[in-house]
Amino acid sequence: MFQNDEIGLFSHKRFSLQYAYHFKLWGGQLSVGAEADMLAEGIDGGKADVGESGDPAIPTSEVDGARFDASVGLWYAHGPWYAGVAMQHVTMPTVNVGEQWQVEVPALYNFTAGYNIKTKSPFLKIVPSVMLRYQGVDFRADLTARVVYTHQKLQLTCAAGYTPNRAVMLQVGGTLHGVKLSYAYEANVAGMGMSSGNHELCVSYRMEIDLGKKGKNKHQSVRFL
């Protein structure tokens, strides 16, 4: 999976290899996943307006750095509902950006739950969901509604989300033959009004790995969207 986030002067890229083991439990399916990550953090100081004197805390050009990381997660689905928990940035790495700057990446804890609502069309469903995120002293709750179109191996998704007192989000994406591509834009609404937000591009690929009985093992993303 490849993820690219840009917020102001800062960029965050993540390259991930993920594996999930699936098995039946209590009439549903439990997935246990692990992920190996390569994080790339960047600061584009050329975009900053620091005045004539300059600011030594901000680089004068674009600098970047990378570190290895890991994530783990659990996912359970039963009938129309699902829930999951995950911990990203298990190693809580410090990324050296350039020669004198550092970016500390704290652990991120996620909880998500949702429900699949059927419509009159066999190809469409509506999925309301909630995600709770905690990272150090920061807590946020995301409320999202997705419309999902599925036909044979094609799946298209359109979503809108709201984070109370913080942001609104729009997302579009699709999956075909195991390749998933999605784009999301989040605009800040805190303060006097809406301001520029951040973009997210995510590309992932899913394939089945048969290590024993058919259908027991699969490789897939455990990242929550």
Kindly give the residue locations of the regions a language model identified:
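Subset of outer-membrane beta-barrel
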Residues: 1-225
